[in-house]
Amino acid sequence: MRVNVTLACTECGDRNYITTKNKRNNPERVEMKKFCSRENKQTLHRETK
């Protein structure tokens, strides 16, 4: 079962991206390096509730 998750920048807190994940294969929170337009660089983005 795939669910939509929101990714938030760990440095500025902006919620920049929406993606999907499979809860059965990835029960923990998703972390990805993505581009943050406010920081103007690649930062770590984590799944929010």
From Swiss-Prot:
Q: Which gene encodes it?
A: rpmG2
Q: List the disulfide bonds.
A: none
> So which domain of life are we looking at?
Bacteria
Which molecular-function annotation in GO is an example for this chain? structural constituent of ribosome
GO cellular component assignments: cytoplasm; ribonucleoprotein complex; ribosome
Keyword Ribonucleoprotein listed? The answer is yes
Note the PROSITE patterns from the entry: RIBOSOMAL_L33 (PS00582)
Concerning its family, UniProt says: Belongs to the bacterial ribosomal protein bL33 family.
Example GO biological process term? translation
Arranged from A to Z, the UniProt key words for this protein are:
Ribonucleoprotein, Ribosomal protein
InterPro entries of this UniProt entry? Ribosomal_bL33, Ribosomal_bL33_CS, Ribosomal_bL33_sf, Ribosomal_zn-bd
The keyword Ribonucleoprotein is annotated on this UniProt entry: yes
The protein's name in its UniProt record: Large ribosomal subunit protein bL33B
Which source organism? Staphylococcus aureus (strain NCTC 8325 / PS 47)
